[in-house]
UniProtKB/Swiss-Prot annotation:
Residues that coordinate or bind Zn(2+): 16, 18, 38, 41
Protein name, entry field: Large ribosomal subunit protein bL31
PANTHER family: 50S RIBOSOMAL PROTEIN L31, CHLOROPLASTIC (PTHR33280), LARGE RIBOSOMAL SUBUNIT PROTEIN BL31A (PTHR33280:SF6)
Source organism of the structure: Aliivibrio salmonicida (strain LFI1238) (Vibrio salmonicida (strain LFI1238))
Keyword rRNA-binding included in the entry's annotation: yes
Lineage: Bacteria, Pseudomonadati, Pseudomonadota, Gammaproteobacteria, Vibrionales
Keywords assigned: Metal-binding, Ribonucleoprotein, Ribosomal protein, RNA-binding, rRNA-binding, Zinc
Subunit-level organization: Part of the 50S ribosomal subunit.
Family: Belongs to the bacterial ribosomal protein bL31 family. Type A subfamily.
One of the record's GO cellular component terms: ribosome
Length: 72
């Protein structure tokens, strides 16, 4: 392998919105990242439903133009 062309591989600290923290190795340029869900709080792994408000494009469209289609 060539010397000096590969990104630095270092420890990154991840913090979830539930408070869970863990470290992993990555070539990511940041020292810390924030996660919305992790293995401790994701509904698939916990079996509990949790509402995650992401406010997607469809919601924005319905908010802007939802009243137009209802007039009949």
């Amino acid at each position: 392998m060539k010397v000096g062309i590969h990104p630095e591989y270092k420890a990154v600290k991840a913090t979830c919105s539930c408070g869970n923290e863990f470290e992993f190795k990555s070539a990511l340029g940041k020292d810390t990242i924030h996660l919305d869900v992790c293995g401790e709080c994701h509904p698939f792994y916990t079996g509990k439903q949790r509402i995650v408000d992401t406010g997607g494009r469809v919601d924005r469209f319905n908010k802007r133009f939802g009243a137009i289609g209802s007039k009949k």
